[in-house]
């Protein structure tokens, strides 16, 4: 294979829609339960369009500064897609700590420690939507929906009582209950934008 062919995608390799999903703390590598439910729901709402899914590669441990590693990985994949699949509509998504990863790459509130791969200025035109679940920034009054760049195309879902995103939350089970209703709600929102 010629060296120039490495890392490039052909049109048939490019999905119509690509979900970049960052899983939550202690979820097994991959999309996790919430990411899988969201991607499945979205596939059922976009007709015959193809939906790819990229699982952000990062530790997702209780060392929350590792969210920067996830942000660097997500940003790298997003930039790859923009450069190699310019017609693919991107959807950025995450759950819990993974929502924090999406916060970091979208600069809400500011890039985190160790994040050194910011998105170039042309990326927002390729991002159709952002959907996050149990976002820690929401607890601080900084949901993605207030972003001047991303707000109109963002849905930042917090179950009532979720202690990670609800300032009055005290129900850990609420934090685990995003598959189903909330993932379907987010898929409806995103399907209207892609």
Residue ranges and their predicted role:
Residues 2-17:
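C-terminal region of N-terminal signal peptides and the immediate post-cleavage residues
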Residues 13-89, 160-183, 187-192:
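Active-site catalytic motif of lipid deacylating hydrolases and related acyltransferases
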Residues 72-151, 155, 164:
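Serine-dependent carboxylesterase/thioesterase catalytic core
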Residues 9, 54, 155:
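A broad, low-specificity signal marking well-ordered, structured residues that form hydrophobic/aromatic
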Residues 5-8, 188, 192-194:
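N-terminal charge/polar-biased segments
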Residues 2-3, 101, 183-187:
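Hydrophobic alpha-helical membrane segments, chiefly transmembrane helices and signal peptide h-regions
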């Amino acid at each position: 294979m010629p060296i120039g062919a490495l890392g490039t995608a052909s049109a048939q390799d490019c999905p119509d829609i690509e979900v970049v999903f960052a899983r939550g703390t202690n979820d097994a590598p991959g999309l996790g339960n919430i990411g899988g439910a969201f991607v499945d729901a979205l596939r059922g709402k976009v007709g015959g369009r193809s939906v790819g899914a990229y699982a952000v590669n990062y530790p997702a441990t209780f060392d929350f500064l590792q969210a920067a590693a996830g942000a660097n990985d997500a940003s790298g994949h997003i930039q790859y897609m923009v450069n190699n699949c310019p017609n693919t509509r991107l959807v950025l998504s995450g759950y819990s700590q993974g929502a924090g990863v999406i916060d970091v790459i979208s600069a809400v509130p500011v890039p985190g420690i160790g994040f050194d791969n910011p998105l170039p200025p042309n990326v927002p035109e390729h991002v159709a939507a952002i959907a996050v679940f149990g976002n820690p920034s929401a607890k601080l009054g900084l949901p993605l929906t207030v972003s001047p760049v991303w707000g109109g195309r963002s849905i930042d879902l917090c179950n009532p009582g979720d202690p990670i995103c609800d300032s009055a939350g005290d129900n850990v089970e609420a934090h685990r209950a995003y598959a189903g209703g909330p993932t379907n709600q987010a898929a409806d929102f995103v399907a209207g934008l892609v």
